[in-house]
């Protein structure tokens, strides 16, 4: 064989191997492009979380810390989101990422500080003395007198015959006067 033929065979081998590499690279890039378009069309991207799925995910992410449905004031970067948006607006109607979920977790409570406060309560604080028996006896005597002689200054309400609205009015009074009974005790 002449040197020309040898050069031609060598050039042909180089060209064949180059074409093989180019076609493999081209095929691989085409395959990746098809996979990317297929996953985008089927919605395999970031998913949204709503309802029970959102609550379960928040419980899993936040653990024992707990979580908020709306951000507490002054917590996290509030400059990019409006004040009335919560986790439902951010994760149910848009895609939701782990970082966004973690922003709604309650702050970490330091367990060591909580334990030391509990320990201080048990060791440093003096116990409160029990109420003396003399005070208890006075209270019991007052109870007996009240039971024997009911207070005659309170007017007794008598239901009017044939009028069923008094009980409704009474219930309304009870409900509307909670917290400010004026010394009267209502029982439901």
UniProtKB/Swiss-Prot annotation:
Cross-referenced InterPro entries, in alphabetical order? IGF-I, Insulin-like, Insulin-like_growth_factor, Insulin-like_sf, Insulin_CS, Insulin_family
Segment D: which positions? 107-114
Region listing for B, in residue ranges: 45-73
Propeptide residues?
115-188
Q: Where is this region: Disordered?
A: 115-188
UniProt region (C), positions on chain: 74-85
Gene Ontology terms, MF aspect: growth factor activity; hormone activity; insulin-like growth factor receptor binding
Query: Do you know which CDD domains this protein is assigned to?
Result: IlGF
Superkingdom, taxonomy of origin: Eukaryota
SUPFAM superfamilies (UniProt xref): Insulin-like (SSF56994)
- Which Cys-Cys disulphide bridges does the record give? 50-92, 62-105, 91-96
Q: What Pfam families does the entry give? A: Insulin (PF00049)
| Cellular component, GO annotation | extracellular space
- Gene3D superfamilies per record: Insulin-like
UniProt GO BP: cell population proliferation; insulin-like growth factor receptor signaling pathway; negative regulation of apoptotic process; negative regulation of release of cytochrome c from mitochondria; positive regulation of cell population proliferation; positive regulation of phosphatidylinositol 3-kinase/protein kinase B signal transduction
Q: Where is the composition biased (Basic and acidic residues)?
A: 140-153
Q: In which tissues is it expressed?
A: All the isoforms are expressed in embryos, juvenile and adult liver, muscle and brain. At least one isoform is expressed in heart, kidney, testes, ovary, adipose tissue and spleen of juvenile salmon.
* A, as annotated region: 86-106
Alphabetized, the UniProt keywords read: Disulfide bond, Growth factor, Secreted, Signal
Tell me where it resides: Secreted
Q: Which family does it belong to?
A: Belongs to the insulin family.
Q: What does this protein do?
A: The insulin-like growth factors, isolated from plasma, are structurally and functionally related to insulin but have a much higher growth-promoting activity. Acts as a ligand for IGF1R. Binds to the alpha subunit of IGF1R, leading to the activation of the intrinsic tyrosine kinase activity which autophosphorylates tyrosine residues in the beta subunit thus initiatiating a cascade of down-stream signaling events leading to activation of the PI3K-AKT/PKB and the Ras-MAPK pathways. Binds to integrins.
Indicate what this protein is called per its UniProt record: Insulin-like growth factor 1
């Amino acid at each position: 064989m002449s040197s020309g033929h040898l050069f031609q065979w060598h050039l042909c081998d180089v060209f064949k191997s180059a074409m093989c590499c180019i076609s493999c690279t081209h095929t691989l890039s085409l395959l990746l492009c098809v996979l990317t378009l297929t996953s985008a069309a089927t919605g395999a991207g970031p998913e949204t979380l709503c309802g029970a799925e959102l609550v379960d995910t928040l419980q899993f992410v936040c653990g024992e810390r707990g979580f908020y449905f709306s951000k507490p004031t002054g917590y996290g970067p509030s400059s990019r989101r409006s004040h009335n948006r919560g986790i439902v607006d951010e994760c149910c109607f848009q895609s939701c990422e782990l970082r966004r979920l973690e922003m709604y977790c309650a702050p970490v409570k330091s367990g060591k500080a909580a334990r030391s406060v509990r320990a201080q309560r048990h060791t440093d604080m003096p116990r409160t003395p029990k109420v003396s028996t003399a005070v208890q006896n006075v209270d019991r005597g007052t109870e007996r007198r009240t039971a024997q002689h009911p207070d005659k200054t309170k007017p007794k309400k008598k239901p009017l015959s044939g009028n069923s609205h008094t009980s409704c009015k009474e219930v309304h009074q009870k409900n509307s006067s909670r917290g400010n009974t004026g010394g009267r005790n209502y029982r439901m």
